[in-house]
Amino acid sequence: MVREGRIGAREVAEHAGCSVSAVSLVVNGKDTGRISAELRERVLAAVTELGYRPNRSARSLVTGDSGTVCAVLPDPANPFFGDVLAGLGTALGDEHTLALVLPTSGTDYDARTVLRAYSLDPAGVVLISPGEPVLRDLVPRCPTLVVDAPGRTPALPRVDLDTVAAGELISDHLTALGHRGFGYIGPTSDKPTFRTRRRAFLDRVADADVLRTLDLPGWDPLAAAVTMASVLPEWLDSGVTAVVCADDLLAYGVLAALDRLGRGEVAVVGMGDLPFSQLCRPALTSVDFAGRRAGEVAGRSLLSWIGTGERPRRTRVPANLVVRASTRGG
């Protein structure tokens, strides 16, 4: 007979004819080799019949696992971060709750944002594309893993996007098409990921006939289009025939500016391979950083760390160049 009111571990134990500790082992997934298979099945049957749901707060006192993983990210409106979160959520499954911690203003976070994440007493934290000051000042309070912060990340396991390969893939593709004059557009950002993207490409084309660079203060494609409409004429007159952007959002602005100028023959490449890149005209050639895959790897690594106490190794997720019409190769 099912009792009214909240069902607890004691009721499950009575129903299954076992101890409360046996119930705890089963519901926390720690029963392997410690109780019989027959007892495990009895406990699971009682859990199902009674509709028992473990009290997460009580469980955290015993296991040290609050059941919450915090993801700290810069800009929730950027579809790339949505891909990372989707992969992270898939890896965490039903066992952990994914809590998003966002900047209170602007499109980037600082050390205070990370402190807000730690104040939730999470089982683990994932920092997505953090800036240099965040990494420099960070004092981890629980298993903390970084996604997309290449370079010297002190004392933190990380999942890297292959930003170095991105520069190589783009430069090899464009030079194979005969381009010798390049423009590069990036953000005014302290983030390691954008420094690496910039350096990887510019080092690869250091002997180009023409090389122009520009840093923009934001990611708004419309603002980028306005700025580039005034900059591109000089670039093109100097011999620039291909423009590379550190992010697809900037590339959309470049495509719009080129369309306004009637210079559709200029090649444009982005990074991130956002969903809209297939739909814009011309369709944008872009580097796919496999954001969903990076999120899955980060989630699995963090869960293993939480469960075993063993720090995961650094992982790099391969990048791939998706060639489309904007470089006349697709």
Positions of the model-derived regions?
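N-terminal helix-turn-helix DNA-binding module of bacterial transcription factors
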Residues: 1-64
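Short beta-strand segments enriched in small/hydrophobic residues
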Residues: 20-25, 62-75, 173, 181-187
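Alpha-helical structural signal in soluble globular domains
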Residues: 46, 87-91, 196-207, 253-261
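Hinge/beta->alpha junction and helix N-cap segments in small-molecule ligand-binding domains
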Residues: 56, 74-83, 101-109, 159-169, ...
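Alpha-helical recognition/docking segments in bacterial nutrient-uptake
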Residues: 64, 68-172, 233-238, 242
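Flexible loop/turn connectors
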Residues: 229, 233-330
